[in-house]
Amino acid sequence: MKKQIFTLLCACLMSEMLFAQSTWFNDKDLTLTGVYYYPEHWDESQWERDFKQMHDLGFEFTHFAEFAWAQLEPEEGKYDFAWLDKAIALADKYKLKVVMCTSTATPPVWLSRKYPEILIKYEDGTVLDHGARQHASFASPRYRELAYKMIEKLAQHYG
């Protein structure tokens, strides 16, 4: 008898849980899925294929420009958004939303060479150099100034 009551109780709970899940969550409230994509690392002729595949796989958004400061500002004060405009247009064509990143994790080589004071310096005197991510010090006023300018240009162009 106890076994039958337990089985009946479990069956009721299971059906309630399944019913509740179907009423609690509808598609529009579920987490969106996305992918990081670095168009600056791929030949432009491959972009459309890649965006189509993202769409076909069910991705809903992509991140751009996370590590692209050197492509956005190849020389100090000279900005190039043409390549990124093309990538955004293709993302839009395939119904992908774009999360625009600020590129501050990877300063361009010209910045590290012209302003070495922006580089992280450890207590033992070791100085990080260009060639890895996160080698600039957020404590550096010069770095913050130049990062702000780049972010401002990005915002002006896409805002």
What is the role of each PLM region?
Residues E48-T126, E152-A155:
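Aromatic-lined substrate-binding rim segments of carbohydrate-active enzymes
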Residues M17-A20, I151-G159:
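Short, intrinsically disordered, charge-balanced linker/junction segments flanking boundaries
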Residues L32-D43, A65-L84, L128-K149, A155-H157:
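The substrate-binding groove and active-site-proximal loops of carbohydrate-active enzymes
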